């Protein structure tokens, strides 16, 4: 991991914050499955080689980093919001709910949360949003990996229950194969109906 991944944290340490966590989500875009979020507090300048935005890493590399992050972290938490909650309160609010649940699992209380993106929410502690934070902040990058691997594992497990959809391959995203399965089999309980309105309106 390059030292540049600690620049944002360093600025905030210098501003007086002592315990900084990173927060990121996985699964905002899929047609099926929950949205996951993770919150991670790494020790200052923890060196985790190859840590970067999880979207830029191979699945193999993410899985190698997952236990390293969990081992090195001062604290971490993983939260989800279900597909039912996504349909009820919309994906943005459900993402915030998953983040809130991840933060609630932290066994160490942070005094600042760095959150990937540009949407702020009151989580009961100081928050700073960082666009592309998953490639700029070590803590957000670590959270990105935990959220992505956790969600992928969940969707792979669901493929055993609903083998006709190929969740182990596309993880619920709107691939051609996924839409073809929807045409043939209809929806299952994992599908986000609010994401499928246009699909069914066109039929």
Predicted regions and their residues:
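RNase H-like, Mg2+-dependent phosphodiesterase core
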Residues: 1-203
């Amino acid at each position: 991991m390059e030292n540049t991944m600690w620049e944002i944290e360093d600025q905030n340490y210098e501003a007086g914050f002592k315990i900084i966590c990173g927060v990121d989500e996985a699964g905002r875009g899929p047609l099926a499955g929950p949205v996951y979020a993770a919150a991670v507090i790494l020790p200052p300048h923890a060196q985790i080689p190859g840590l970067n935005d999880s979207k830029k890493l191979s699945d193999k590399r993410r899985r190698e980093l997952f236990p390293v992050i969990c081992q090195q972290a001062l604290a971490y938490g993983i939260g989800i919001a279900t597909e039912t909650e996504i349909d009820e309160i919309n994906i943005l609010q459900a993402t915030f709910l998953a983040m809130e649940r991840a933060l609630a699992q932290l066994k160490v209380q942070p005094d600042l949360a760095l959150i990937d993106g540009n949407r702020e929410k009151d989580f009961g502690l100081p928050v700073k949003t960082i666009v592309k934070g998953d490639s700029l902040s070590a803590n957000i990058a670590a959270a990105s990996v935990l959220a992505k691997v956790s969600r992928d594992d969940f969707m792979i497990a669901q493929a055993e229950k609903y083998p006709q959809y190929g969740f182990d391959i596309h993880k619920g995203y709107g691939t051609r194969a996924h839409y073809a399965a929807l045409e043939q089999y209809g929806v299952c309980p994992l599908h986000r109906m609010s994401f499928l309105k246009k699909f069914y309106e066109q039929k």
